[in-house]
Amino acid sequence: MLDPLPPPPPWLVNWVKPYSEALYLPSLPYHIHEVLGAFVLYQTTQSIISPMLSNILFPHIYPKLNRRTRINWDVHVVSLLQSLLINSAALWVMFKDKERKDMNSSAVERIYGYTGASGLIQALATGYFVWDLVVSARYLKIFGPGILAHAVTALAVFALGFRPFCNYYGPVFILYELSTPFLNIHWFCDKLNMTGGKLQWYNGMLLLSVFFGCRLIWGTYQSLRVYQDVWHTMHLNIQSGPVLREIRESPHSSIFIPRDGQLCLGDASCISAQSEVMKFTGSQTLAIPFWLALVYLTCNLVLNTLNWYWFGKMIETVRKRFEGKPHDEFPRERQRKQSMVELAASELDYDTLSGPKTPYNEKEDEIARAPARSKDNEFARGTDFAKSSAVQDGDHEVKKR
């Protein structure tokens, strides 16, 4: 699928081309306007939009935050905006890009192939991670080395996509961000004095579930697919089908897979989309160099390691919010259940210590329960006494024992 956004102005393409050629990122000039636009959007949101809206929407909270927390607040606003934007775009491309779907049958195209729509996703992600790198480096004491490492490795992974390299996997790994909205909501609940409430509890469960599913299960599986495709392509010497390949007795031979658009039936847009799949690949294209595979796979490994580490920290954080604290909205229910357990335990202890009850003991118990039954009758008639909590009833029975 072609890039749905307009192309960059020619002067910008010509200005970027020398740098992109030096870095061997040939598709970057055609998406540089999207990279810059994303960076400007996120920086403007952090510096202007978030402070302005936060002062209006939360006049009694945001202005009273200290400088450190206010910076963190604005960064979380940007993160929330970016995750909603990039997730929607990535899912749309994965479902609508037919040329990308055709790459499912070819490891070579998944590594070397390119579509404008996937390039858009990589551009938006690159713009965000450039901003993320700047913020993480500037406020290193606030966010720590882990966030900085994430920014560096993520930027490297998505920037390498402009070779193009693993352009197919751009939307795939962006789905890591599906858990980010829940993470930001959890953080905002703490700052809005909603810690321990129902919203934070349910959001926390969704956060752990989505994070585990998207980053740990989906992410690890897709990383293994990347490793497999890279290994296959690096060691590809002979492949059947319409493949032209210069064999130089080395895994660094050039590789080229043409698409002729025969299935487009004269559709001009289809032909254009098909022709750009190998737009930046030709007979002069070298196979994957070892350093590129090493950098990409190492960055991917770092990201996956961070994901597993953060998952453990999130479980610890959620437990601290709720462990040992009765839920604010259910204190009476919790006390009622506790009193029932205590009553049952006391009866069990009595039977264990005193042995089975004699008929005389049972008669005494029957007499002792008579007042409780009368209270139950009053409860059925709707008296005020019947509205007393089950905790008091339970305590009354325990004391009689």
Features from the language model and the residues they span:
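Hydrophobic alpha-helical membrane segments of integral membrane proteins
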Residues: 168-175
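Alpha-helical transmembrane segments and their membrane-interface exit regions
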Residues: 175-186
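Membrane-helix and juxtamembrane interface regions of eukaryotic multi-pass membrane proteins
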Residues: 1-168, 193, 199-214, 218-224, ...
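Blade-edge beta-strand/turn elements of extracellular beta-propeller
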Residues: 188, 194-195
